[in-house]
Amino acid sequence: MNSISSDSKKIKRYRRGVGVIILNKKRKIFIGQRFDKDKAAWQMPQGGIDRGEKAIEAAKREMQEETGIKKNFRVMHESNDWHYYDLPMHLQKKLWRGRYVGQKQRWYVIDFYGSDNEINIKTKRPEFQTWRWSTKNEILSLIVPFKSK
């Protein structure tokens, strides 16, 4: 009789999500500072894919929900693969009722050719307390380490 250890029964579960890299006319990237206790928590717009929703639809929805951008953009690129990250252990139990160990995300590059006054982070359920346009190197120094790999 074969016995299966409880460790091998555990299959890592990742929440399906999307991330959005919004580029302005100067090729800088939108980044927002989250409403978290950790004031250094900056990130690009991202979120989960709803049941029955396509990833591209989720990306556009998340962008609108988090930045207010509804027009003057075009999707330039979709990542070929899912990008995975594991949450730190203390967050795995706290977020999503402990159902997931992390996220797998499909990323989209968006060309935003509108003006800054079209961006409104004071949305129905705001995610960001402030935002700015940044370079790739600035972003890598600002985002939480477990998301930068």
For each feature predicted by the language model, list its residue ranges.
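Acidic, metal-coordinating catalytic segment for phosphate/diphosphate chemistry
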Residues: 1-23, 97-98
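A conserved beta-turn-beta hairpin within the catalytic core of GNAT-like acetyltransferases
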Residues: 37-40
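Unchanged
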Residues: 50-145
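A short gly/proline-enriched turn/hairpin at secondary-structure junctions
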Residues: 43-44
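Extracellular glycan/ECM-engagement signal in secreted proteins
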Residues: 148
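Entry beta-strands of beta-propeller and related beta-repeat scaffolds
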Residues: 28-29
